[in-house]
Amino acid sequence: MAKLDKIRNFSIIAHIDHGKSTLADRILEITGMVSEREKKDQYLDKMELEQERGITIKAQTVRIPYKANDGEEYILNLIDTPGHVDFSYEVSRSLAASEGALLVVDSTQGVEAQTLANVFLALDHDLEIVPVLNKVDLPSSDCERVAQEIEEVIGLDCSEPLMISAKTGLNVEDVLESIVKDLPAPQGDPDAPLKALIFDSWYDSYQGVVVLFRILDGTIKKGDKIQIHSTGRTFDVTTLGVYTPEPQKAKELAAGEVGFLCASMKELNDAPVGDTITLAADPVEDPFPGFQEVKPMVFCGLYPVEPAEYEPLKAALEKLQLNDTAFSFEPETSTALGFGFRCGFLGLLHMEIIQERLEREFQAKLIATAPSVVYQARLNNGEVLEIDNPSKMPDGGDLESLAEPFCRLEIHVPNDYVGAVLKLCEEKRGIQKDMRYLTSSRVIITYEVPFAEIMYDFFDKLKSHTKGYASLDYEIIDYRESNLVKLDILINTDPVDAFSAIVHKDSAYPFGRSLALKLKRAIPRQMFEIVIQAAIGRKIIAKERVAPFRKNVTAKCYGGDITRKRKLLEKQKEGKKRMKKMGNVEIPQEAFMAVLKAGED
């Protein structure tokens, strides 16, 4: 067992692409945790998608023995955290398991929005923060400016920042010395009752659920009967150990240490992230604060292209859910698409990742409907319904009011693009709250915007308006009443539920027109006329028609009586009428994606 004063638990905070995983790689190499043979980039990002997108999705830990310059042996526990805003709850739990954090900032870029969000999370947990300027070997590096930014924006003393290059390994030794010297040792009593924080968990097909935890007080041994605080369920610890970075078994772990355990748990809900582990024989009364159940905020329908693929898709979704409690799904049926699932996600990146994993790991062929947020409908009898699908919207007569989620956007942008960003936020029904200059050339703009407005193309538009220089962070703040209506799309007078959307009344007409036009372009011509209508209730607000193919039925008539030709044309007309009544309109996948791009024209 390690002595408390020789342990350092730390996280690395960084914006995407500022070099967090690369710094972790160098630390593992310098301390000899990864041999030359095993060496590879992004060592801790095990998932193929993490490697490819260059992002960290799941938290990982590594126990690193390190002999410092003072001759003492220290145990450094690196707790690797996701950096993206969708996974902010995981980040807050990982930070709660640490005493300190390395703030890695790209010296060519400066402080970005998501870095800032995670730094403030770290400060909320009273973490000691060490600023590290990365990529100093690049010619465009400007350490003085970035150090000044860190001091002004975050309020950290940055008079002597660590200047490193994680890629080449320059000065990474100094980072390890700084962890030992500047970060505090954990507090805790190994003899007190057990109290440990779960900061991540995943499902292993051999061992069941693997739980990553940090012990605050007490000691845990293999064979102990543990209790999960929020559920009250008890389990026997079958495996206990630490990651170095490969799993290594241990007989016992004590206060201040970070490790993993398996206890024959069958599903992730048995060990929710942020929960407290105690001993069943001696449970603690006060659990670790800040535990919350993660709620999905974005919903969309996922349908198999072939009806026969329904069961394999269900099995794939169940497997993904084993590793991701924030992801939820339930069966639903659509008149247009048949049987499928309504899936809930933390945010847009989370949705993209799940869809990509389904296609990649399970070879699923999917039709995805447009994502929607959760609305709150207040009925005349006072009841409040949560609506995650436009087709569940109650009738107008029963409805008293509709509320939608609002989020606070914090956009970091160079001075030259402020006008373009303000215009974009105003278009999205945003309310400006604040605008302050970090430096003479960089601005932070704060807006409150309906979450539904940033769902589809806000990120893309923001990047294109600012030539890729803007960075963004958002958090959902509250629900507000809005003048919202349900827009239906009718194809040959039949409503198609997959195209329904809830939109603001002011933008309903342009949105409906744009969507009808996009569908007209996406739906191929057929032997009969296709009429596309956009409607609010019974009022048609836009109409487009796809003209039918025309077969020349009179081609075989050479001269002769006009009545013969007329008879053939009448017969064709009758046939087309019957076809229109009976015929099914084939709607391609591109048409479902048209909903996402509606309103752009």
Curated annotation (Swiss-Prot):
- Every copy of the tr-type G domain together lies at 5-187
Q: What biological process terms from GO does the record include?
A: positive regulation of translation
The free-text function statement in the UniProt record for this protein reads:
Required for accurate and efficient protein synthesis under certain stress conditions. May act as a fidelity factor of the translation reaction, by catalyzing a one-codon backward translocation of tRNAs on improperly translocated ribosomes. Back-translocation proceeds from a post-translocation (POST) complex to a pre-translocation (PRE) complex, thus giving elongation factor G a second chance to translocate the tRNAs correctly. Binds to ribosomes in a GTP-dependent manner.
Q: What is this protein called?
A: Elongation factor 4
Fetch the CDD domains from UniProt.
EF4_II, EF4_III, LepA, lepA_C
Query: SMART domains this protein is in?
Result: EFG_C
Where in the cell? Cell inner membrane
**Which residues of this UniProt protein bind GTP?**
17-22, 134-137
Q: Which gene encodes it?
A: lepA
Query: How is it placed in the membrane, per its record?
Result: Peripheral membrane protein
Q: What EC number(s) are associated with this protein in UniProt?
A: 3.6.5.n1
Similarity section: Belongs to the TRAFAC class translation factor GTPase superfamily. Classic translation factor GTPase family. LepA subfamily.
Keyword Cell inner membrane applies: yes
Which InterPro entries is this protein grouped with? EF-4, EFG_III/V, EFG_V-like, EFTu-like_2, G_TR_CS, LepA_C_sf, LepA_CTD, LepA_IV
Task: Name the cystine pairs.
Answer: none
